């Protein structure tokens, strides 16, 4: 209960800071053309830095996807993972916080996303966030989740669920 309260307060502070300052690390009105302000970040552009991309793409899930793990991932996504706050309850990138972010959160129901981005890349983002890196990699303001609020095992479960929203493999 206490950690959930602290996490939600931290989330509110971060979102509030973005709203009041109109900025954030790696956030902008998208001068590089990575997405349209208020629109989704371009799916074709990796969030993983170029010097780490091959390594991230090579990362494979440590266990197979099962219906039980998908259900656990969904429960985390909609609950203590707080993913729904930005990505929406259906994973469409339309959560309550999406309205105040300069770039819309990822729409996991877009099948092109699953086709272009690997599970390893998604885990990299869950571990490192998407804060941008001095013009090399654009950011969206997503904070690291795995290692901060979720275990790596739970991160894989959430990732499996997110990927399931884009249709079958």
Label the model's feature ranges.
Residues 67-90, 98:
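Sequence/structural segment immediately N-terminal to covalent heme-attachment motifs in c-type
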Residues 86-93, 112, 127, 145, ...:
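Detector for the c-type heme attachment site
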Residues 80-81, 87, 129-133, 162-166:
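Sec/Tat-exported extracytoplasmic proteins
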Residues 2-12:
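Bacterial N-terminal signal peptides that target proteins for export
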Residues 10-21:
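Bacterial N-terminal signal peptides
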Residues 28-43, 101, 106, 125-155, ...:
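Axial heme c-ligation environment in periplasmic c-type cytochrome domains
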Residues 43-78, 169:
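Electrostatic cytochrome c docking/interface patches
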């Amino acid at each position: 209960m206490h950690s959930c309260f602290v996490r939600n307060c931290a989330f509110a502070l971060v979102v509030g800071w973005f709203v009041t300052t109109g900025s954030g690390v790696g956030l902008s009105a998208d001068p590089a053309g990575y997405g349209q302000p208020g629109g989704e970040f371009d799916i074709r552009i990796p969030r993983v830095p170029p010097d780490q991309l091959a390594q991230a793409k090579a990362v494979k899930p440590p266990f197979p996807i099962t219906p039980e793990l998908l259900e656990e991932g969904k429960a985390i996504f909609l609950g203590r993972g707080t993913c729904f706050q930005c990505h929406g309850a259906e994973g469409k990138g339309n959560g309550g916080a999406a309205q105040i972010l300069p770039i819309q959160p990822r729409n996991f129901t877009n099948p092109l996303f699953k086709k272009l981005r690997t599970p390893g890349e998604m885990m990299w983002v869950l571990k490192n966030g998407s804060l941008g890196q001095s013009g090399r990699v654009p950011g969206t303001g997503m904070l690291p989740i795995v290692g901060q609020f979720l275990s790596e095992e739970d991160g894989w479960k959430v990732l499996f669920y997110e990927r399931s929203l884009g249709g079958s493999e």
